[in-house]
Amino acid sequence: MAANATTNPSQLLPLELVDKCIGSRIHIVMKSDKEIVGTLLGFDDFVNMVLEDVTEFEITPEGRRITKLDQILLNGNNITMLVPGGEGPEV
């Protein structure tokens, strides 16, 4: 697969896409009933992420809970989907 990426420059690998998102807003859907929106500061090979200016949306039995956080370290094991430039669920 890596050889194919070098012969086709228009192909973008997953970690390259995440790398292009550094410094911009990203919407993250988690395996649990949480969604997170924040500015991506950095990530590692396991897609653990450091985010700032974070809003966490969580579905609870009482309804939707919204939490604002300055900075977080997010474990990549719990990520289902990344949306570059996403603004999160409608409130």
From Swiss-Prot:
Keywords: Acetylation, mRNA processing, mRNA splicing, Nucleus, Ribonucleoprotein, RNA-binding, Spliceosome
GO cellular component terms listed in the entry, alphabetical order: cytoplasm; cytosol; Lsm1-7-Pat1 complex; Lsm2-8 complex; nucleoplasm; nucleus; U2-type precatalytic spliceosome; U4/U6 x U5 tri-snRNP complex
Gene3D superfamilies: 2.30.30.100
All copies of domain Sm, residue ranges: 13-88
Pfam families (alphabetical): LSM
Keyword Nucleus: yes
BP-aspect Gene Ontology terms: mRNA catabolic process; mRNA processing; mRNA splicing, via spliceosome; response to bacterium
MF annotations from Gene Ontology: protein heterodimerization activity; RNA binding
InterPro entries in alphabetical order: LSm5 (IPR033871), LSM_dom_sf (IPR010920), Sm (IPR047575), Sm_dom_euk/arc (IPR001163)
Subcellular location: Nucleus
Modified residues (N-acetylalanine): A2
SMART domains: Sm (SM00651)
Family: Belongs to the snRNP Sm proteins family.
Assembly mode: Component of the precatalytic spliceosome (spliceosome B complex). Component of the U4/U6-U5 tri-snRNP complex, a building block of the precatalytic spliceosome (spliceosome B complex). The U4/U6-U5 tri-snRNP complex is composed of the U4, U6 and U5 snRNAs and at least PRPF3, PRPF4, PRPF6, PRPF8, PRPF31, SNRNP200, TXNL4A, SNRNP40, SNRPB, SNRPD1, SNRPD2, SNRPD3, SNRPE, SNRPF, SNRPG, DDX23, CD2BP2, PPIH, SNU13, EFTUD2, SART1 and USP39, plus LSM2, LSM3, LSM4, LSM5, LSM6, LSM7 and LSM8.
Function summary: Plays a role in pre-mRNA splicing as component of the U4/U6-U5 tri-snRNP complex that is involved in spliceosome assembly, and as component of the precatalytic spliceosome (spliceosome B complex). The heptameric LSM2-8 complex binds specifically to the 3'-terminal U-tract of U6 snRNA.
Protein name: U6 snRNA-associated Sm-like protein LSm5
Annotated organism of origin: Homo sapiens (Human)
Gene name of the record: LSM5
